[in-house]
């Protein structure tokens, strides 16, 4: 019985080698094939002129090439002095949807990509968690989001190109570690289309400690950001019940110390300030205790409004007082500006238009 063809873009490098072996081709050809797919972005096997015609025919018998499709585009100039923040709703070949965001900044252009369709963690302040979990994205589907944003730039004849990549879109990257790592390699390999420095790639996580440990041992030089939001275990459990209970703060801190030590990169602790929840002087002092003694920096983030979620952002004075307490203790602190709020493209707002109307999310 003839096997049904599948999308070759969903295969990692190790899987490409296995696929070639299955059709009696040498595994070393996987590097050529991989470059055609993820650097040259070949649209068909006929485009792969450095591969023999018999090999191209065999590949076409077992596989097809299908890129994700951009279904919707939104943009806003609000809050961004460097240009429009833009969001793409992307439909994957099986009909699932994800969102990806282009964020302009001084001397940089950042692609914010999703690692999963939906999310199973259900953090209380996040729109993606309201969707539930659909599935992990393949490394090709993650890479394809950067391609889609890059295509958008080129179509408008912008001189700017994507310089930074952050895994801060939909889903938990470290519950899809193998495909995230493969996507990082796709996007950072020298002489490939993007060749992005790994030090300009940030992987964000709620704190999946075994995967943080695994990431630290890969030799990758990516940066790590952790959604902390409270240094008090009980409060963190209320905000992020699944992640906080399964990966307690003490165990998380051990992993963060190990990551910073092995990579030489500071860990970013993301802290979303929520009015009356985690914004007190006591909260700041507990954060000081938690963050002291290892290589880290703190990003304070404003809460972005989400329908059916009742948190409130803090006022400017509260945010600045909280920052000052941390800085007076010697911590490196940045107040992170949120871009894309009017189009539901800011931190915590991505939900893949799951109601059919992104304006309602």
Curated annotation (Swiss-Prot):
<dbReference type="InterPro" id="IPR040072">
    <property type="entry name" value="Methyltransferase_A"/>
</dbReference>
<feature type="binding site">
    <location>
        <position position="204"/>
    </location>
    <ligand>
        <name>S-adenosyl-L-methionine</name>
    </ligand>
</feature>
<keyword id="KW-1015">Disulfide bond</keyword>
<feature type="binding site">
    <location>
        <begin position="171"/>
        <end position="172"/>
    </location>
    <ligand>
        <name>S-adenosyl-L-methionine</name>
    </ligand>
</feature>
<protein>
    <recommendedName>
        <fullName>Probable dual-specificity RNA methyltransferase RlmN</fullName>
        <ecNumber>2.1.1.192</ecNumber>
    </recommendedName>
</protein>
<dbReference type="Pfam" id="PF04055">
    <property type="entry name" value="Radical_SAM"/>
</dbReference>
<feature type="active site" description="S-methylcysteine intermediate">
    <location>
        <position position="347"/>
    </location>
</feature>
<keyword id="KW-0819">tRNA processing</keyword>
<feature type="domain" description="Radical SAM core">
    <location>
        <begin position="105"/>
        <end position="342"/>
    </location>
</feature>
<dbReference type="GO" id="GO:0000049">
    <property type="term" value="F:tRNA binding"/>
</dbReference>
<feature type="disulfide bond" description="(transient)">
    <location>
        <begin position="112"/>
        <end position="347"/>
    </location>
</feature>
<comment type="function">
    <text>Specifically methylates position 2 of adenine 2503 in 23S rRNA and position 2 of adenine 37 in tRNAs.</text>
</comment>
<keyword id="KW-0411">Iron-sulfur</keyword>
<dbReference type="InterPro" id="IPR048641">
    <property type="entry name" value="RlmN_N"/>
</dbReference>
<dbReference type="GO" id="GO:0051539">
    <property type="term" value="F:4 iron, 4 sulfur cluster binding"/>
</dbReference>
<dbReference type="InterPro" id="IPR007197">
    <property type="entry name" value="rSAM"/>
</dbReference>
<feature type="binding site">
    <location>
        <position position="123"/>
    </location>
    <ligand>
        <name>[4Fe-4S] cluster</name>
    </ligand>
</feature>
<keyword id="KW-0408">Iron</keyword>
<keyword id="KW-0479">Metal-binding</keyword>
<keyword id="KW-0963">Cytoplasm</keyword>
<dbReference type="InterPro" id="IPR013785">
    <property type="entry name" value="Aldolase_TIM"/>
</dbReference>
<dbReference type="InterPro" id="IPR004383">
    <property type="entry name" value="rRNA_lsu_MTrfase_RlmN/Cfr"/>
</dbReference>
<feature type="binding site">
    <location>
        <position position="126"/>
    </location>
    <ligand>
        <name>[4Fe-4S] cluster</name>
    </ligand>
</feature>
<dbReference type="GO" id="GO:0030488">
    <property type="term" value="P:tRNA methylation"/>
</dbReference>
<dbReference type="GO" id="GO:0070040">
    <property type="term" value="F:rRNA (adenine(2503)-C2-)-methyltransferase activity"/>
</dbReference>
<keyword id="KW-0004">4Fe-4S</keyword>
<keyword id="KW-0698">rRNA processing</keyword>
<dbReference type="InterPro" id="IPR027492">
    <property type="entry name" value="RNA_MTrfase_RlmN"/>
</dbReference>
<feature type="binding site">
    <location>
        <position position="304"/>
    </location>
    <ligand>
        <name>S-adenosyl-L-methionine</name>
    </ligand>
</feature>
<dbReference type="GO" id="GO:0002935">
    <property type="term" value="F:tRNA (adenine(37)-C2)-methyltransferase activity"/>
</dbReference>
<dbReference type="GO" id="GO:0046872">
    <property type="term" value="F:metal ion binding"/>
</dbReference>
<feature type="binding site">
    <location>
        <begin position="227"/>
        <end position="229"/>
    </location>
    <ligand>
        <name>S-adenosyl-L-methionine</name>
    </ligand>
</feature>
<dbReference type="GO" id="GO:0019843">
    <property type="term" value="F:rRNA binding"/>
</dbReference>
<dbReference type="GO" id="GO:0005737">
    <property type="term" value="C:cytoplasm"/>
</dbReference>
<dbReference type="Pfam" id="PF21016">
    <property type="entry name" value="RlmN_N"/>
</dbReference>
<keyword id="KW-0808">Transferase</keyword>
<keyword id="KW-0949">S-adenosyl-L-methionine</keyword>
<comment type="similarity">
    <text>Belongs to the radical SAM superfamily. RlmN family.</text>
</comment>
<feature type="binding site">
    <location>
        <position position="119"/>
    </location>
    <ligand>
        <name>[4Fe-4S] cluster</name>
    </ligand>
</feature>
<dbReference type="GO" id="GO:0070475">
    <property type="term" value="P:rRNA base methylation"/>
</dbReference>
<feature type="active site" description="Proton acceptor">
    <location>
        <position position="99"/>
    </location>
</feature>
<keyword id="KW-0489">Methyltransferase</keyword>
